[in-house]
Amino acid sequence: MFKDRKDAGIQLAKKLIGYKNKNVVVLAIPRGGLPLGAIVAEALNAPLDIVLTKKIGHPLNKEFAIGAVSLQGKYVADSAEATHRYIEEETRRIRKILRQRQDQYYKNFAPKILKDKIVIVVDDGVATGSTILATVSLIKEEEPSKIVVAFPVGSSSAINRLYNSPFIDEVVCIEVPKHFNAVGQFYRNFNPVLDKKAMQILKESNKHFIVSKYE
């Protein structure tokens, strides 16, 4: 059980300290992964960026991911209990949100270059692994030297899926509970991270690393 995302981020950073001052870029999955990603990036003396992916929630439990969407593609779990119509409607809705976030987050700054970098993908927890798997499939196209996925808590089934991914080099997880329903149950405080706060975190974290897209 974690007190909040700050507590989880501090504990996660300790697990990743071996990457300090290496050729690392920390990628947070917004919005929940950003508070943790900022703590990890600071501890490792690394720049922080985001990945524009968002989960497709189960029709009866939006917090439980049955897939994930990016601007370029989507991933849906084989066991997803949802209609094709629901998946397509959610995909359109989510892509609209992602385009808005792209405009907001990258209004003045360019995304980090990932080629030949050690990329550490951070989220606040993993229920199915769908979001991270979709994320990693996009990251791999940018030819990083290594991909690490890191999160405080995850289901055993998700951990197995991530370990079996040919694109993931290392999985770092603090807790793998026997009984797992949703990520939020393992936080005392799991309040949502609003876009305004997320953008502030990203800006503050990158004061020494940000490169303007106009340079």
Question: Which residue stretches match the model-derived regions?
Answer:
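PRPP-associated nucleotide enzymes
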Residues: 1-215
